[in-house]
């Protein structure tokens, strides 16, 4: 759920800046409690504090064409997370990055099976949602999943650089 939310944030950032990405990279860092409990026997690494932790999971997905479409970014990041993560381990940190980011020039090679009208409709919807968020705050338009247990989107939207910004509506308090 959190990875899907992070991919959605990435989608809005790319859309706002009129950028597209050729691939995304996901890194999942595990908590040291996995080693401290004594049951973990996999690969390890040393963190910046000198503690032994499980080796982080890392993976990249390349797209057929550069994109900033939410459907692609969200679905592919969720699949990548499922593929690279050890479900038996406690996750401490998740990082998602867009790679080979270029300006969105709107002209990309598509195959005969791509529904270009559907893609354009999705882009327009993303731009409309972004306009609403910019005008009324980041929490003005949310998916229902942002209200599920374990979701962090609403709290993330009220932060600046990972720290509390004061308001729960995603707007800065004056």
Mark where each language-model region is.
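Basic, low-complexity intrinsically disordered segments
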Residues: 1-174
């Amino acid at each position: 759920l959190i990875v899907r939310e992070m991919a959605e944030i990435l989608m809005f950032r790319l859309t706002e800046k009129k950028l597209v990405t050729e691939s995304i990279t996901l890194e999942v860092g595990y908590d040291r409690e996995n080693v401290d409990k004594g049951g973990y026997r996999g690969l390890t690494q040393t963190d910046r504090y000198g503690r032994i932790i499980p080796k982080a999971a890392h993976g990249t997905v390349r797209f057929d064409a550069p994109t900033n479409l939410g459907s692609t970014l969200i679905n592919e990041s969720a699949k990548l997370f499922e593929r690279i993560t050890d479900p038996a381990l406690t996750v401490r940190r998740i990082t998602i990055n867009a790679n080979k980011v270029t300006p969105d020039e709107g002209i990309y090679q598509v195959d005969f099976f791509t529904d270009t009208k559907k893609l354009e409709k999705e882009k327009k919807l993303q731009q409309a949602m972004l306009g609403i968020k910019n005008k009324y705050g980041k929490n003005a338009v949310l998916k229902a999943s942002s209200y599920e247990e374990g979701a962090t989107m609403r709290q993330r939207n009220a932060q600046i650089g990972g720290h509390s910004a004061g308001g729960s509506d995603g707007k800065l308090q004056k």
